[in-house]
Amino acid sequence: MAPKSSQSSQGLSQRSKQQTISSFFTPKPSQTPKAPPKPAALAVPNGADQDDDDDEDEDIAPPRQLTPARKRSIDEQHEDEEAGRSSPPKRVRVANDEPRPSLGNASATTLNAAKPPKITERTSKFLFSSSPVVRDETDAKDDAAATQKLREKLHEKFVKKLGRPDSFAELRRRNKVISEDNGNGEEGEGEEDEEEEEPAPKPTKGRKGAATKKTSKLTPMELQYLDIKRKHMDTVIVMEVGYKFKFFGEDARTASKELGIVCIPGKFRYDEHPSEAHYDRFASASFPVHRLQVHVKRLVKANHKVGVVRQLETAALKAAGNNRNTPFVRKLTNLYTKGTYVDDIEGLETPTAGAQATGYLLCVTETNAKGWGTDEKVQVGLVAVQPATGDIIYDDFEDGFMRSEIETRLLHIAPAEFLIVGDLSKATDKLIHHLSASKTNVFGDRSRVERVEKPKTMAAQAYSHISNFYADKMKSSQEGGSEQGAILDKVHQLSEHVTICLSAMITYLSDYALEHVFDLTKYFQPFSARSYMLLNGNTLSSLEIYQNQTDYTSKGSLFWTMDRTKTRFGQRLLRKWVGRPLIDKERLEERIAAVEELKEGEHTIAVDKVKFLLGKIKTDLEKVLIRIYYKKCSRPELLAALQILQDIASQYLSAKTPEQSGFSSILLSEAVSNVPKIYEDVNSFLEKINAKAAKDDDKYGFFREEFEAEDINDLKLSIASVEDDLNTHRKDAAAKLGKTKVDYVTVAGIEYLIEVKRKSVEEKKVPASWQQISATKTTLRFHTPEVKRMLQERDQYKESLAAACDTAFKRLLDDIAAKYQSLRDCVSSLATLDALLSLATLANQPGYVKPTFVETTELDIVGGRHPMVEQLLLDAYVPNDVHLSGDATRALLVTGPNMGGKSSYVRSAALIAIMGQIGSYVPAESAKLGMLDAVFTRMGALDNMLKGESTFMVELNETADILRSATSRSLIILDELGRGTSTFDGVAIAEAVLDYVIRDVGALTLFITHYQHLARLQDRFNGELKNVHMSFEERDGGKEVVFLYEVAEGTSHRSYGLNVARLAKVPEKVIETAEVKSSELEESMGISRVANMARMVKGLLEDGGEEGLERLIEGIEQL
């Protein structure tokens, strides 16, 4: 017998070799008992028992089954191929010479006695025996030889059927790829429930590193995806697969995070990294086709660039074509970013979330003009485009090191996306980062930033690019030569920096198929046209023009107060008016007259008609028109827009001239007379459309029959012919089944099924050529070969018809786009009516009055109120007067207790001036307003850590900018200038600035301060400066102060900061200590003042000069 140690060493040597396929299918010796011995008399000759031998082989060593399909196919092939081949003799255990004792005549002792010859080595350990059974060495050798023969036989069989064992995993992957290449070219296309991908096979416990040698084979669809992805690595790609959209790799992880959809594990990288060698597919995530815009919008809002890859072939046409075994042709059809997303169908009829969401894409470039540090000057060019409406703003300007000019423009435009051409200076870069990087920024949401290179020859390239762009547009347009020349002249007059931005913007938007927006040169507008009041960034923020300073929402802002519009395009126009008050008195008078006419005729037929028609508009017509121009409009959208325009135009058919409009105001009469001009065009478009089909988005019935194209009509007839043949085929099918009549049924979307009852006479008559499609316990459902052929033919016609219908729809959109300008002018007129009606609704609020405008620079407001605080307060707002004039009192020095209402008072004056020049009524008893060219503010105490500037540095920078920019027609508001440094320095700077503003600039000024020392400046300026304070009452010995919020003449000598501390719930112990220290300081200051006066009296007695007498009187007044 072989010793146990030698057997174990033999097993180790076998395991050290590479495992064969047969080793996976052969049971381990410890798990499978040996077959019982057979009597020798039952043996048969080899040739006569061939099949039995094969069966016995499987009984002895049944292979381990991976999948039922594979086991079955292997067995069948094994039986077929081994039928005619001889096999080696079967090993049969030889019986002992002695007869076996039967159970009947055996004694208990004999039965229970150990029988060593009958006990194997494997079972000996389970016996209650003290010593192991010793086997005969000859039997052990025979067993080993037979087992080795059996293994070799199985090994040969599997090598013959499957190739080398170590290539089994590769074969399985190859089979999977072949199955995907058949039919549609990739897995699961056109199926509703795609099969789950099989996980990669686990590496075998063989040689070290065996798993890393396996290389994955990507499917044709994944290779197609990789090809597109490599060209757009910065884009989240979503690919159409059947009627699902799929993300792959890292994009799947991004989509799972942003959209909350499941990510199926797999490769995340695109470079075949060894760390992901155990995966044979990309990670993926998917959603249904009809949810595309919902998910794209969410990704775009999260600042991702999204690319949509669509199938350009249909299943039926592909099956009939020559490329039926290749993947579907796919192409990147759409790109979206925050500034270029114009497919927001869902949001057209919903109320706007916030006024700051303007959707502008802003392109900016910059060069150093001169200097560096605080003397740095940069030349900035910008172009801002609103793709959703077609508006374009451009500007070219010089800016200082504070970047106040560019900040003003950014706050006005509030872009959703930046396109930066070349490198920007650190100051500009930090400003853009500061304004755009936070979710709670002044734009209301984080903005996306894209950068492009700027070569040294960019200016020349840009000029050439723009010239070619517009020259090509002119060739394909229908405009006359003079109009073409005018457009080119207008473009060539743009400055170098604007030209660079325009060229970069055209190139950038070409990727999104939105470059057509630049065809509309009529809507190019310069930002810095001097027909508007300048409201810089600080003013917009301090006066809360567009959003409050608490949570950066529109509630509590001036725009929120004035917005009573009924349409989205009217709201956008009013937002522009609020940020750009007029300084042209003639235009301002026209606007205010229109508001007055609407206010006075509130319940007249003409005004009620305008309100009613605007109230009916639930569609954003301005956005729909530009989507028509881009050819991105849907059928229901188009129908709704055309029907609204037709309805409104039909109401004013009798008002084709301004005189027939029913209004006396120029603005109103011109706006109303513009509306009916589009009636004939809109009517001609609607005549071609089947309203019911368009509403249901039915492309096949979209056009009325008399306006259908010939190819559409032919394809419809072909489909009808096939369906007629299908109906006729029922007689043939009935004859084959022996029935008089057969009806088609539709189950689970599968049409033209023929049902046959189980166990019926008809079931036996079903031809073998009929294909069973589905079945139940009682019914079988079939397609005949003729039905299959005709259905395939019908599907081809249907898909050709769909393509023809899309082409015809595009032609209609082209025809409408040719009339874009007249349609846009009509919508602009409706927006003007809506904005004017909003101002008229505000004017009807109690306490609002029509302002009077004068040529001189003055503010004469009686009973003025803060427009936003008044609406938010539950109590009545206390009105105050403001009297400023360039000829008389030019500045007010405002003092008073903390929280006494100083800031609210000066803000109300500025807001009333702005509202008046917007063309609105104002919250006051009366208001006489001069035409201001700008409002400047320096309010609040903020540092700027991004620029490394302290609070005091920010104060002085902003103040210096105001002093450089202000004119005698400006209004300046300075709030507690100098508080960021020591008292002496602060007083000195505040006095110097106030002196400069009054003497040199001559602007109207409201100056808030707590420095009583400045009050003595009143006498220096001979009535140009006046002291006022916010009145109050002291109670309980000065411990309690009641704020009256009324402006009174004179100076407040105390700020009552300790009372504010009590209101803020500062601990009483702290307040008591502060009171003691305050008394001590006041006493020491009083003593020093008395000593100073004593010296002044002494000097007066010695010198007797008038100058010493004046200083003595000032000192006595301060006491």
UniProtKB/Swiss-Prot annotation:
SMART domains: MUTSac, MUTSd. Residues 204-215 have a biased composition (Basic residues). InterPro entries: DNA_mismatch_repair_MutS-lik_N, DNA_mismatch_repair_MutS/MSH, DNA_mismatch_repair_MutS_C, DNA_mismatch_repair_MutS_clamp, DNA_mismatch_repair_MutS_core, DNA_mismatch_repair_MutS_N, DNA_mismatch_repair_MutS_sf, DNA_mmatch_repair_MutS_con_dom. Gene3D superfamilies: 1.10.1420.10, DNA repair protein MutS, domain I (3.40.1170.10), MutS, connector domain (3.30.420.110), P-loop containing nucleotide triphosphate hydrolases (3.40.50.300). It is found in: Nucleus. Residues 1-19 have a biased composition (Low complexity). Transmembrane segments: none annotated. ATP binds at residues 896-903. Keywords: ATP-binding, DNA damage, DNA repair, DNA-binding, Nucleotide-binding, Nucleus. Its main location: nucleus. It comes from the Eukaryota. Pfam families: MutS_I, MutS_II, MutS_III, MutS_IV, MutS_V. Residues 212-339 are annotated as: Mispair-binding domain. One of its GO terms (biological process) is mitotic recombination. Residues 49-60, 183-198 have a biased composition (Acidic residues). One of its GO terms (cellular component) is nucleus. GO terms for molecular function: ATP binding; ATP-dependent DNA damage sensor activity; double-stranded DNA binding; mismatched DNA binding. Residues 1-148, 173-215 are annotated as: Disordered. Belongs to the DNA mismatch repair MutS family. MSH3 subfamily. Heterodimer consisting of MSH2-MSH3 (MutS beta). Forms a ternary complex with MutL alpha (MLH1-PMS1). Component of the post-replicative DNA mismatch repair system (MMR). Heterodimerizes with MSH2 to form MutS beta, which binds to DNA mismatches thereby initiating DNA repair. MSH3 provides substrate-binding and substrate specificity to the complex. When bound, the MutS beta heterodimer bends the DNA helix and shields approximately 20 base pairs. Acts mainly to repair insertion-deletion loops (IDLs) from 2 to 13 nucleotides in size, but can also repair base-base and single insertion-deletion mismatches that occur during replication. This is DNA mismatch repair protein MSH3.
